[in-house]
Design a protein with these regions (language model features):
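Acyl-donor (CoA/ACP) binding surface of acyl/acetyltransferases
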Residues: 1-37, 70-181
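A generic secondary-structure signal
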Residues: 57-61, 120
Length: 181
């Protein structure tokens, strides 16, 4: 499959992940405030080679198979610095995920990144439905879903790095997304 394009927003560059990003991911990812609401499959404590293993063994092979699309998040004002990651996944009930280094949170950057990849999901990949699971206590992620017109469709329990929490499933259809643009 064709390599994912670099995406641009007002303040961000979303560049497809590559093996060379491992060092920066290893520096910014393994922080409790980043990982606590992620799926329990994320190892914690995060191993010293966790980012390299993740890129080499999981992310890059799924990109090559056309099953997932992963981008590093970078500021246009500092394009050499990776500050987070946003991904699209071709999985049932799990189509978008992200993390952002703590010092960059609360500035609307993830809203920009999510908007760009959601547009890619609906317009380029021609998908009709986007579903996003999350730990219910992750209020910032919930607010992003609410602001972008997603609907809460299901609640159950899930295992996360920080433990067992109520889990929410949010969705938006392509038609709903287009009406809100």
């Amino acid at each position: 499959m064709e390599r994912s394009p670099t995406l641009y927003t007002e303040r961000l560059i979303l560049r497809p992940l590559e093996l060379a990003d491992a060092e920066a991911i290893q520096q910014h990812f393994p922080h409790w405030e980043v990982v606590r609401y992620l799926n329990a499959l994320v190892p914690w404590p995060y191993p010293a080679d966790g980012a390299l293993a993740y890129l080499r063994d999981i992310a890059l092979p799924t990109i090559a198979r056309g099953e997932e699309w992963h981008w590093s998040i970078r500021l246009k004002s500092a394009p050499e610095q990776l500050i987070g990651n946003v991904s699209l996944m071709n999985e049932p009930d799990n189509n978008r995920g992200f993390w952002l280094s703590p010092q960059w949170q609360g500035q609307g950057l993830m809203s920009e990144a999510s908007a760009a990849v959601t547009q890619y999901w609906f317009e380029t990949l021609d998908r009709s439905l986007l579903r996003v699971p999350k730990a219910a206590p992750n209020l910032a992620s919930r607010r992003l879903s609410e602001r972008t017109g997603m609907r809460l469709i299901h609640c159950d329990e899930g295992d996360f790095v920080g433990g067992r929490f109520p889990r929410e499933l949010w969705e938006i259809t392509r038609e709903e997304w287009r009406r809100l643009r």
